[in-house]
Amino acid sequence: MFYERSCFIFDLDGTLIDSLGVWSQVDQELMRRLSNGRVMLSEDEAGTLRIRAMKTYGEGSDAYLKYMADLKRAFDLPGTPEEIHFQRYSLAQEFLRTRVHYREGAAELIKYLKALGKKLAIVTTTRRRNIDVY
């Protein structure tokens, strides 16, 4: 089939690893903790808030600080946007270590292709520091 090819390129998130829902889970837990259980978002609600913020502010640290400021205002959360962002980052690192796993068959396929001497590449928009946690 494709095994005669010498190089394979894989997308990371959602293809090799099942990480797409983890960001909504991070935001759910962040809101629960910061509000002492007063704010309980569904995974869909958390995802919608984050996606809306990224569409409004773009990507990058500044966008996430603005997103944290929005959450602070909307839900009357304690702390500065910077403090909330730091807590989100810490929580995300924990979730990435403990909740993100290879998709079924992905690890075996990578090992098989490597054993065949194929060149492998991974592409992603994920920040390197998060990839290192996976």
Task: State what each model feature region is.
Residues 2-104, 112, 116:
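N-terminal helical cap/lid subdomain that shapes the substrate entry/recognition surface
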Residues 87-88, 106-134:
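Substrate-recognition element of Asp-dependent hydrolases with the DxDx(T/V) motif
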